């Protein structure tokens, strides 16, 4: 019988190598498929994508850029035809200036029109405030309207109960803030208040404490004890306890309800704890005849049409509250065209000084023909982290300057181009 032989083809490639080749081919196919799908998807998006200029057009009149991007502010006119209508089918070319955050219009190559009015200037929505003139201030017979959060003088502000004791072994003054009664309503929505108390020992002002906030009550019971070490008993007669009663506000600065001043000259805690109750009175803001002085420097570049304003320093600023604490001043610079504010900037806060040195400069692009209608207002403000900031005084240079020195300073700046002109000015009441 013949022998049967099975003949099988032989492969030079091993099974492992064949598997690797197949995997590589699969990866390449998947990659090509993903790439083709991505390209097609991007093409479809481009066809349905809204041009970016339409988005900016939707936001016209709204500042979409932060003010801190640059210190430059541009003041540019709107181009109009003789008949008063805008060019290009009755509309001006609105542009958004990304550097300064101001709306502007294309410049006319022939130069700005001599006839200008306030509504022709690009004004940010938050720059729509008008310049307050000292000539239009309230007369002594008139009274400012009071807000719901600020109590009037004839409104009872309640009373505060506390106790004073002295720990002789530890040489420590012990003050317990117990409770308050009959506080006024500071929140019109909830018809209540969120009171707390800040206490300072005068005149050294080194010891400052505050209680916790009690929610929605006009008769808070604090019952908190504070111990002040290192105060000799012999010095108690020279100290004054200052209690500042406030109402917490989650969304803005806290409201000041009133204050209590207690000289320890008539208090003798040597025999034990002395409990006292005092009426809360309206906070006494010192009214000073002198508001201090401010030194500023101005320089105008007619070729670049650029005004450089430098806030140099201030001196002899008044203390703004009865506690006599050193102020935390800063300067707010407002630029007005006519009565409309078109730019605003402010310096950094200088802590615990009444003679601050700022040395901060701001640059504004102002066409030469607009200078007669430009005013620059400097507001010196006392910063308070807890309560509302107090305006120490103000200075106006330019078209609405009410002082001889201010008008003279502005005239020198306009008549001496490219030359910085620095002067001291007395601050007036705001």
UniProtKB/Swiss-Prot annotation:
Cytoplasmic side: 37-430
Residue segments, region Disordered: 132-154
One GO location term (cellular component): phagocytic cup
GO biological process, one term: negative regulation of endocytosis
Changes after translation: Ubiquitinated, at least by PRKN, and targeted to the proteasome complex for degradation. Ubiquitination is inhibited by ATP13A2.
Domain C2: 156-278, 290-425
Comp. bias intervals (Low complexity): 140-150
Membrane topology: Single-pass membrane protein
Summary of the tissues where the protein is detected: Highly expressed in brain and at lower levels in other tissues.
Domain free text: The second C2 domain/C2B is required for the inhibitory role in both clathrin-mediated and bulk endocytosis. The transmembrane domain and the first C2 domain/C2A are critical for the inhibitory role in clathrin-mediated endocytosis or bulk endocytosis, respectively. Unlike in other synaptotagmin family members, the first C2 domain/C2A does not bind Ca(2+) neither mediates Ca(2+)-dependent phospholipid binding. An aspartate-to-serine substitution in this domain inactivates Ca(2+)/phospho-lipid binding.
Subunit structure: Homodimer. Can also form heterodimers. Interacts with PRKN. Interacts (via C2 2 domain) with AGO2 and SND1; the interaction with SND1 is direct. Interacts with KIF1A; the interaction increases in presence of calcium.
Family as reported in the entry's similarity comment: Belongs to the synaptotagmin family.
Protein name: Synaptotagmin-11
Species for this entry: Rattus norvegicus
